[in-house]
C-alpha cells in the first residue's frame, strides 16, 4: 500500500484516536471511536462543500477490492494530468502512462484490466476535470 495511506491511517488512529483499524484476513475494517466527533468538526470546516461529491465517490467504490480502488485512483490521476497538460488523451495513452511511468507495481495488472477499469470509470462518471496539481511520481 501507499505510504500516504499509512500516514493517514496513523493520524486518524494513533495520533487522534478517531478510528480503530482492524486488520481482517482479506480486508481492513475501520471502527469509529467516540473521539470521532472531533474529526467531524474538521471535516465540516474543510470539506463540507464537497460532501455530495465525496459521498457519491464512496458509494461507487465502497465495494471495490483494494486493487481495483488503486487502479481507479491511479487512472484518475494519470487522466487528470493529461487534461491539465492539455495533451491529447486516449485510453491507450492513459494505460501506457500508468504502466510505464508510474511505480513498477502497476505492471502487475494487465493492460486489458486497466482498460476495463477505465471503461467502468467512464460509465459511472468518475471523470477528472483537470483540477489540482500534476501528479509527482517518486523514484522507486
Where are these regions (language model features)?
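Domain-edge interaction signal
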Residues: 1-140
Amino acid at each position: 500500500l501507499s505510504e500516504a495511506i499509512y500516514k493517514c491511517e496513523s493520524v486518524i488512529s494513533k495520533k487522534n484516536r478517531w478510528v480503530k483499524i482492524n486488520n481482517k484476513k482479506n480486508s481492513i475494517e475501520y471502527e469509529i471511536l467516540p473521539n470521532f466527533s472531533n474529526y467531524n468538526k474538521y471535516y465540516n470546516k474543510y470539506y463540507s462543500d464537497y460532501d455530495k461529491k465525496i459521498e457519491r465517490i464512496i458509494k461507487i467504490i465502497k465495494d471495490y477490492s483494494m486493487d481495483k480502488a488503486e487502479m481507479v485512483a491511479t487512472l484518475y490521476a494519470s487522466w487528470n494530468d493529461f487534461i491539465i497538460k492539455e495533451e491529447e488523451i486516449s485510453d491507450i495513452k492513459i494505460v501506457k502512462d500508468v504502466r510505464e511511468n508510474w511505480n513498477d507495481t502497476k505492471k502487475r495488472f494487465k493492460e486489458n484490466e486497466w482498460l476495463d477499469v477505465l471503461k467502468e470509470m467512464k460509465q459511472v462518471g468518475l471523470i477528472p476535470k483537470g483540477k489540482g496539481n500534476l501528479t509527482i511520481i517518486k523514484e522507486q
